[in-house]
Amino acid sequence: MTSTEILSKIERYCAYQDRCTQEVVTKLRSWQIEEQEQRQVLQVLKNDGFIDDERYVQSYIQGKINAKQWGVQKIKLGLLQKGISKNLIDKYIKDINPEQYTDNIQASIHKWTQNHGPVTQENIIKLYRHLMAKGYTYEEIKSVELKTEN
């Protein structure tokens, strides 16, 4: 592949949805592009606005909060696995709307109870495990559960 073909192909890849730097590097490696050419392509993509890790972090967080109703812990882990710096993650994690976050926990509890019946002593551990797997902390779950009971 020529440099122009590579650039054209990777621009389409980035235009389809927001991509972080690591995703683009992985794609370029899968095409067996040399290290020096990878750096040049990445620089062009960043200059042209095809790659922007800050924009990626913002859209990732909003997508996981709104669509998947994930908790902060799972979002952080997902971003760290994509090679995003902890400082950048922390910068945008604090922008999460606390009311929406609490509503997401309540909605997850409601959905779980529709599938598994009311929360009882026997199945409360399963509920907590489910919510913690979605990335919520024990304290967050407990505070929402107490509000729901009162």
Short names for language-model regions:
Residues M1-N150:
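An alpha-helical, amphipathic repeat domain used for nucleic-acid recognition
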